[in-house]
Design a protein with these regions (language model features):
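A short glycine-rich, Lys/Arg-flanked "PGG" loop and its adjoining helix->strand segment in the class I
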Residues: 136-151
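A C-terminal cap/extension of S-adenosyl-L-methionine-dependent methyltransferases
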Residues: 4, 10, 63, 89, ...
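Acidic carboxylate diad motif detector
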Residues: 154-156
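A short acidic, Gly/Pro-enriched loop at the edge of an enzyme's catalytic core
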Residues: 107-123
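A short SAM/SAH-binding and catalytic strip from SAM-dependent methyltransferases
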Residues: 121-134
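Conserved class I S-adenosyl-L-methionine
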Residues: 67-80
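Class I SAM-dependent methyltransferase Rossmann-like catalytic core
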Residues: 16-66
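Acceptor-substrate binding/catalytic loop of class I
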Residues: 48, 163-182
Length: 243
């Protein structure tokens, strides 16, 4: 009896090894996450490690740490002032609530003359402006409270969940174009706006994964079509005639 040897065409999966390799290839650990209707973490991944957005926030602040000096204002607490600052002479913490024991200034950022004028060399504003309805007023107040030559280091969410305490006052998401227009109207040309993140980073962040659970090589990829957050480095003019 003549034996016949089966010839496997290039690219065809052998019947003796049906699709197991393909299943492993196309069913990564992400698939169960993508089938969920609720995230793995309800607090942006804080209970699993550092949230994915913090990876980008800390990279941005590290890149501009030379500006975190002199008299520094930060919102909520002074963690980034302490971690990235050098030559910090005075540190203030801004909060809208007097219940925050770390707050040294209790004020609404969107109110005119809420903050001391020309007081700060650096203002660290991390993931805050989405909670301020009157953005134009807030940016004017930020500009007013900086010293001439003072620097704003700001991060803005492009993709994020709404926190359980913020359903009533989470107003905005940002793109580089919207951030550029918002800050250019007040700071003029002395702004640098960038976006960071990609599809994988956005998916992981919304799913509640921590940054430690995602490959840093992939987190480093920036896709302008899938920004996770927007960063703004804005300098107040040293000229007293500047807006």
């Amino acid at each position: 009896m003549t034996s016949r040897t089966a010839v496997k065409a290039p690219g065809v999966v052998s019947p003796s090894r049906p699709r197991r390799g393909l299943a492993r290839l196309f069913r990564p650990a992400w698939i169960p996450i993508l089938r969920r209707t609720k995230p793995l973490s309800g607090v942006w991944g804080w209970d699993r490690g550092a949230p994915v957005d913090r990876y980008y926030i800390e990279k941005f602040l590290d890149q501009h740490r030379r500006h975190i000096r002199g008299h520094v204002l930060e919102v909520g607490d002074s963690r980034y002032t302490g971690h990235f600052g050098s030559g910090v002479v005075n540190s203030d913490v801004l909060d809208i609530s007097a219940a925050n024991p770390q707050a040294t200034i209790v004020a609404d950022l969107a109110l005119t003359d809420a903050l001391p004028e020309s007081a700060f060399d650096c203002f660290i504003l991390v993931q805050t402006l989405q909670y301020v309805f009157d953005l134009e007023a807030a940016v004017r107040e930020i500009h007013r409270t900086l010293k001439p030559g003072g620097v704003l280091l700001c991060t803005l969410p492009s993709v994020t969940r709404i926190g359980s305490r913020y359903l009533a006052n989470d107003f905005w998401r940002f793109t580089p174009a919207s951030a550029r227009g918002l800050f250019r109207d007040v700071f003029g040309a002395a702004i640098e706006v960038t976006s960071v993140g990609n599809l994988l980073a956005c998916t992981a962040f919304l799913a509640g994964l921590a940054a430690e659970e995602v490959s840093e090589t992939k987190l480093r990829v920036s896709d302008p079509y899938f920004p996770l957050l927007v960063t703004v480095n804005a300098r107040k003019s040293s000229s007293p005639e500047a807006v």
